[in-house]
Structure formats: structure tokens, C-alpha cells
From Swiss-Prot:
Pathway entry: Purine metabolism; 7-cyano-7-deazaguanine biosynthesis
Protein purpose: Catalyzes the ATP-dependent conversion of 7-carboxy-7-deazaguanine (CDG) to 7-cyano-7-deazaguanine (preQ(0)).
Enzyme class: ligase
Protein's name according to its UniProt entry: 7-cyano-7-deazaguanine synthase
Protein species of origin: Rickettsia massiliae (strain Mtu5)
Amino acid sequence: MKKKAVILLSGGPDSTTVLEIVSKMDYEIYALSFNYHRRNSPEVQKIQGLIKDYNVKQHRVINIDLQSFIGSALTDDNIDVPKFKHTDQLPSDIPVTYVPARNTIFLSYALGVAEVIGARDIFIGVHTNDYTNYPDCRPEYIKSFEAMANLATRVGVNGEKITIHAPLINMTKEQIIKKGLELGVDYSKTISCYDPTEAGLSCGQCLSCIARLDAFKKNNVQDPIKYV
């Protein structure tokens, strides 16, 4: 009988690469996505097409309201998503696109689902380029959440172990794209943009788009998605 795994799936290249990696392992896959603001709606739409390429047992889309976390460009309509032209313009501190407690909320949902379905493995697509901008992507955070998960659940108290896997955590965006291309990931079905159009076109100028374009460029590959 296959072990069960919960994967946090955003529709971006990182979590899709994780899905590809896990699909080649001996797991029954349960994917978990979140619809939390109009700006991430195109991500959720992309996932519907993406998920068909994989043997996913179940895909859940959870609607949550993060608009109470004002101050983030990803949840507050009154804040514009910053735009850039080059990677050397990208912020070196925590940007306005940081959403307070987002990964903690997402991982908590994943933990709850894992307990319900009997999974002991949770996968997330954080990586080295996330460390500076997003504190809830750091290795220390992942380890701390795993420790909490094993203290705060029936599974953990009963002596079983829940593991938070971050297979990309020591990889750069460039390395992730290279790995995904080698594995056969169809990146045309992914989206990274923080500020996409209603038609789902990427802006090409937000932090996430610039980082994505740079990663493909460094791999000497044309990014297959459409930009404005």
C-alpha cells in the first residue's frame, strides 16, 4: 500500500517541480491549493490544467480570506505590486509582497489534511532565493514547523512522525528550472506572476516574474509562458 503525501501546490514552477519529483516516488498524492485573493486566482486556474498531467489522488482548493492581513500587495487592493526591470533592482529585504504568516497558514491546513487522510509526509517548494525576502521559507522555519507539528498533533503524541519535506530548499531558482527541465516539467502550464492580467498573462516586471525570467535565461531556455 502506497504512503500518502500532501503537496502544497501554487501553480508556480517551484511547487510544480516538487510535484514532478514526488510523482516519481512511491506516494499517493493529495495536492492542496489556496484561493485567497483576485491576484492569485490565475494560479488556481492554471492548476486545473496542470494537475491533469499527474496521477493525483485528490486536489483540494481551499478558499480563505487573507485580506485582513492589510499591508501586503498580494492581499490589499490599495497597494500596488512593485515593478522592476532587472534582477539587480530586486529588494534585498522583506518586500511589500510578503504576506504575514502565509506559509504557516498553508502548512497548518496541510497538517490538518494530513492527519485526516493518514499522511505522514508534507511537501513544500521553498528554495534559497526565498530566504532573504520571505522568512517563512527559511530552513530554520521548516524545521521549527515540523517540530511543532509533532508536538501538537495526535499523530505526534502517539509516537508517529510527521515530516515536512522541502526538496528544493538548497537550490536556486536557476537550479530548480534546470532540474525541472531534466525531469520533463511542462512549465508552459505554470504561472509565477504577482500581478497577472484578468486573462492570466504575466506582467513580466514583478519580483517573481523577473526571478523566473532570469532563471530561464541562465538555462538558455525561452520561458514558455505569455507575458503582457
